[in-house]
Amino acid sequence: MITLGLDETGVREQTLQLAQSYQSLLLEQRFDEWIELWAEDGTCEFPFAHESRRRVYQGKREILAYMAATPGRIAIDAVTEMRVHPMLDPEVAAVEFAINGRLLATGRPYNQRYVAFLEVKDGKIWRYREYWNPLVSMEAHGGLDEWLSADTETLSGEAS
């Protein structure tokens, strides 16, 4: 759906700007501003989360509650890569990013790479899907058993 008043180029630029703002506000922990980028009925998905953990957050309240807890779980030392890619659909963007940090519960390194797809409707994010390597998370926890038995709200996309 093309946003009223914008041509395809304007919509694509708006989508790419939303993707940039999404990442920068989240990494800066400016959650009150970050959540305003979302549609009321937005969906945040983590398809690679373990089957025992929650993979979908629906609506601004759930999404904000989940993401605002991240700083208490992961210390991000650096964002080592960030690229936003336009797609054929002007209301979709792909985002690649990588972080270096550590899992606070164990002190172990958490150096993760992500690919995410952001979809926009009426100028707001209505769907975000983030893919990451679960093996990095398992290693940060100290192994599979520790990962599976850890607090189910430990890392992005690993909630129950």
Segments from the language model and where they lie:
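A short hydrophobic beta-strand element
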Residues: 90-99
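Short, cysteine-centered beta-strand-loop-beta hairpins and adjacent loop/turn segments enriched
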Residues: 73, 101-111
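Hydrophobic pocket/interface hotspot
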Residues: 22, 34-35, 42, 59, ...
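A solvent-exposed, acidic/Ser-Thr-rich amphipathic alpha-helical stretch
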Residues: 37-91
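Short, low-complexity N-terminal intrinsically disordered segments enriched in polar/charged residues
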Residues: 1-36, 40, 146-160
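A short acidic/glycine-rich loop-to-helix N-cap element
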Residues: 6-9, 105-109, 136-145
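Short, surface-exposed coil-to-beta transition loops
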Residues: 78-79, 109-116
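Short beta-strand edge/turn micro-motifs at domain boundaries
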Residues: 113-139
